[in-house]
Amino acid sequence: MLYLFYKKYFFRPLRRPTYKGIAMKTIYILLTRSGTLLSKLVYAVTGASYTHASMAFDEELNCLYSSTRKNGYTMFPAGPSKEYLNKGVFRLRGDAPCALYALDVTDEAYVRARRRAEHMMARGELYRFNTLGLILCALHIRWQRRRHYFCSQFVSEVLEKSGAMELPKDSTLMHPNDYAQLPQLKCLYEGCLADLPQRKAMELGEAPTVVSVYLGLMLGLAKAGVRKIF
């Protein structure tokens, strides 16, 4: 009931955009800095506000696509995989800074982009995380390796190969922060992940699980212990 109330009065769907009478669809790009070990390393090297990029094809962000940790928690195995706002690192790191952007594309480009992303998810065993490419990207050195992608390279490849947009530089050199500078993208939200409207809507709509209750209790006890020490 709370979920339906929130969605009706606070989560307003965007009007479908048009350009010169042509119906357009929207691809969403979510930038985050989760504070994981890899995120901290990238942040230490680049100083970028955001260290991870994901993409979605629905405004509720029910499913995000990227090249990242496959099980949602541990760093490896990694490669093209789906992410969820209420699972894995996104669930544990509600205080992570994030920004949500919208890119309006033609119906044809939208279909091609979604099809390409889904294909890579379905054939996930063929793809790997581009660890060396990520390191070289931070040093502004191009490194293309077949079927290997880091997060922003994955998003860039899907957008470029589908004809959704033209990139200002090679996909292997695209940083998550670069998307925040693109004039084609419209910023819909900037703040902490826990306050993202789509994340809030999910939390209102889900029933608490034994694991979530247990994690909540453990976090509460840990915070109480820290207060006693200091």
What feature does the model see in each segment?
Residues F5, Y19-F230:
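Cysteine-nucleophile amide-bond enzymes
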Residues P13-T18:
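N-terminal polybasic/positive-inside topogenic patches
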